[in-house]
Amino acid sequence: MFINYAHRGASEYAPENTMSAFDMALQLGANGIELDLQRTKDGKIVIFHDNKIDNKSNKKGKISDYTYQELLDFDFGSWFSLKYKGEKIVLFEDFAKKFLSKSLTFAIELKDEGIEKETLDIIKKYATHNNIYISSFDYKALENMRKIDSNIKLAWLIKEKINNENINKLLNDNK
């Protein structure tokens, strides 16, 4: 099967990682959705890609600088188009309620270490299938995820050149 991932939702048509982008992805026929998870100051898991919100909202700083309630007051849509003025940040659990029961494949990137258990708890609560891949550049986060659930599908994102050390690590950890 060929997976047509909507990267951060239909991010060419709506502000990335918003409900509008995820809804648009389905309208356009995507059979996969890629998204990014981070933790807020008060411990909530939200969907957002960048390290800072400066270019994707009407405020400045990091997701971890704000509580979820504070983030709800920010505009995450106008940067893309005034049509999306007032677009809210998405709580991962709200996304999960709406989408994880659908016949789609999901690529969920962990941007922060330490959100593995809560992420898995939410997935297990709402997912009706196992077409979910957890990815991260942080190998430790993936190791933590594997310890919690030995059956979860993992994908290690690598920035540097692939070398024998990385290959051996993957082979040994996937026995």
PLM regions: where:
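Phosphate-group recognition and catalysis centered on beta-loop-alpha active-site segments
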Residues: 1-175
